[in-house]
């Protein structure tokens, strides 16, 4: 059976709110929102897609680019980036752009941690890990990282990497035994089934006889781990667990993991020619954005056509967060590149957000403009910065998590 047919056969089956609220006040049934994080490490240039600063004399824009808009979503149009226009024309109504997001550093690793956890604390958990650990613990792999960064913090038990060398599929099919320096013979399929059944019966017996306390906790944890292992082994011929090399393979893996109910959160990574464009900024940024939006279009198309786990499609259940840990300076340097800048932009697509809208902006110095967090409108007088921790707190709220527990005192973007 083809993977696509299997997903359809086994499936268990965005309204815009008044006042143009950027984030929905309610969640899907049972806090069931799923998340896909697409991390673009290196620092993209928002002025090549998200920030049409053509009227700003302090910003170097491409001479052959033009401002464009689909509904209320403004973007930078360029003949060499047709995938960007195509994506906006198709999905603008479900897309929200956050402009001028403050990430208070210009060092890659610090910015990446700030962008994904809201803090530079080494023990902090990223948004996907928190969402998976707090309200997604029943999934076999609550947060799976196909590629890119991960900050599990206290939720390490809920985060899994597929591995850059096929470690996860090797674990599932038993071929990891071949990696051992000591010869090990794997049991036959029949013997493995007998052992699985025996272990399950022993776990049931143990959990039925223990009186509570530490033994009960350990027994239940062991039983849960065993159930998850059986679930994953049952899918080892269906899912391409090693799909972490190219972005297209990562997208396929994400769709499988979400549609089959394996994961609540998936992290992907896109690089192509690399985003850290200290030289030849326009050449590499343009190529990167074109290929990125080709991949994003495929991701969102698949979400919209793949049955979800709660009825409808995955698009009705999933939020896609596309980010880069920093922006680039407003002006080109002597090498026709751009250097690090602490203001970036983000793209959020899918369930729970008001699409066709831009929140935030840039001032004449290309600093992020403050926003009234209650309305989402720019407020240069009394507004607050749209900082990475505010974005994170808002995403946690979308996930059904009390953000105050993990980002105390940080406001959310309600408008």
Question: PLM features: what roles do these ranges have?
Answer:
Residues 3-415:
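Ligand-binding pockets and gating/stacking loops
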